[in-house]
Amino acid sequence: MRLSRYFLPVLKENPSEAQIVSHRYMLRAGMIKQQAAGIYSWLPLGFKVLKRIEQIVHEEQIRAGHIPLLMPTLQPADLWRESGRYDDYGEEMLRITDRHKRDMLYGPTNEEMITDIFRSHVSSYKDLPLTLYHIQWKFRDEIRPRFGVMRGREFLMKDGYNFDLDYESAIHAYNRHMVSYLRTYERMGLQAIPMRAASGPIGGDNTHEFLVLASTGESEVFYDAAITDLKFGDRVVNYDDRAECEAIVKEWTAPYARTDETHDEAVFGQIPEERRRSSRGIEVGQIFYFGTKYSEPMGANVVTADGSRVPVHMGSHGIGVSRLLGAIIEASHDDKGIIWPEGVTPFHAGIVNLKQGDSSTDLACEALYRDLSARGLEPLYDDRDERAGAKFATMDLIGLPWRITVGPRGISAGKVELTNRRTGESEEMSSGAAVDRLAQIYAGI
């Protein structure tokens, strides 16, 4: 993409309404525009990152054997009355009446609707286990929306639902989701720690939240520092192997890690003092096992091998897709702007032409743009007639992991400058070497 043809409405000054770094940089970098309290339009740069995150989530869900579908944002209220949650949910739920005076709602979550889909089409234990998921916009009418996409009213979420014959199978689904989530977040350059948490309005006996440590997080968390040394890495997982998934879950849940709702000071005090930590965290996902909480009242039953009918065991599992943008920025920025991890960057590298209109630099930039694109990479070429300082400031603000700087002096020596945004380190090399280096880096992502 050529920046001269791209829609990137960057702001020079910090917006007064932005209280935290991620909100400030998302507005300044032209990623979002607020349309109402807690409701945003996603502008091209922000939308690209959103789609990168969504793609990683899809890939890891499918890797784990989960099946995508798509449910509507509007739901009939009768489903929620059937489960008993319609009156319990409170004023966060946006309730709507259509022209036929039927009660509807803008879904804050989808347990009732997915249970209705299941009971309409599945009746035998032979069709189990089954896990369905979708990525869809949700709405919760927060009383005080703030912090940009971190606590908006409308948000994009991946929510998945498992249906199993018995408790043991449902716990395997729970473990499978935890393993899948660990891999998902690490691919995004995040360390998201699974912490024992409260189940809230969704309910259930077993739940973990995934939290990214950040001073701007809304959750108070307590943990053993040993958990921050764990890395999922590139291990290959057989998601059908119950023992393997259980072992990974034990590895990640053995160190103490809890939110304030479930914190146990007595247990925490048994950890060596030098490893005890308290901090703030940003919730980016949560997994639940809630047994027959929805299947029993809604009649989601299957016929077993002996002919009896039993309610299925269920769980739900969410990832805050749009919130993840804010969490990544909170965890990865400096005083110049965003620093995108390579896995979610909107463009793989920026090309800065220091002397637009100079034939040698123009030709070199065009060749770089063409060669990077031919290797399957997406460069952002700053071909604007602007000062070098302004171009560098834009690149630093939008946070592309790599920048290739092309100037007359370097081109005369057959060199360009490749700069790492995170470290600030620069290296001169040929254009071909720069293309090869970037292709190699992204081949491993």
Curated annotation (Swiss-Prot):
Q: Report the superkingdom from the record.
A: Bacteria
What Gene Ontology terms describe what this protein does at the molecular function level?
ATP binding; proline-tRNA ligase activity
Q: Which reaction does it catalyse?
A: tRNA(Pro) + L-proline + ATP = L-prolyl-tRNA(Pro) + AMP + diphosphate
Does the keyword field hold Magnesium?
no
Q: Where in the cell is it found?
A: Cytoplasm
CDD domains named among the record's database cross-references: ProRS_anticodon_short, ProRS_core_prok
Q: Name one GO biological process term.
A: prolyl-tRNA aminoacylation
Provide one Gene Ontology cellular component.
cytosol
* EC code: 6.1.1.15
Keywords, A to Z, come to:
Aminoacyl-tRNA synthetase, ATP-binding, Cytoplasm, Ligase, Nucleotide-binding, Protein biosynthesis
Which InterPro entries did the record assign? aa-tRNA-synt_IIb, aa-tRNA-synth_II, aa-tRNA-synth_II/BPL/LPL, Anticodon-bd, Anticodon-bd_dom_sf, Pro-tRNA-ligase_IIa, Pro-tRNA_synthetase, Prolyl-tRNA_ligase_IIa_type2
Pfam families assigned: HGTP_anticodon (PF03129), tRNA-synt_2b (PF00587)
PROSITE patterns given for it? AA_TRNA_LIGASE_II
- Name the job this protein performs: Catalyzes the attachment of proline to tRNA(Pro) in a two-step reaction: proline is first activated by ATP to form Pro-AMP and then transferred to the acceptor end of tRNA(Pro).
Listed under subunit, the entry gives: Homodimer.
**Family note:** Belongs to the class-II aminoacyl-tRNA synthetase family. ProS type 2 subfamily.
This chain belongs to the protein called Proline--tRNA ligase
Give the source species. Answer: Cereibacter sphaeroides (strain ATCC 17023 / DSM 158 / JCM 6121 / CCUG 31486 / LMG 2827 / NBRC 12203 / NCIMB 8253 / ATH 2.4.1.) (Rhodobacter sphaeroides)
* Source lineage: Bacteria, Pseudomonadati, Pseudomonadota, Alphaproteobacteria, Rhodobacterales
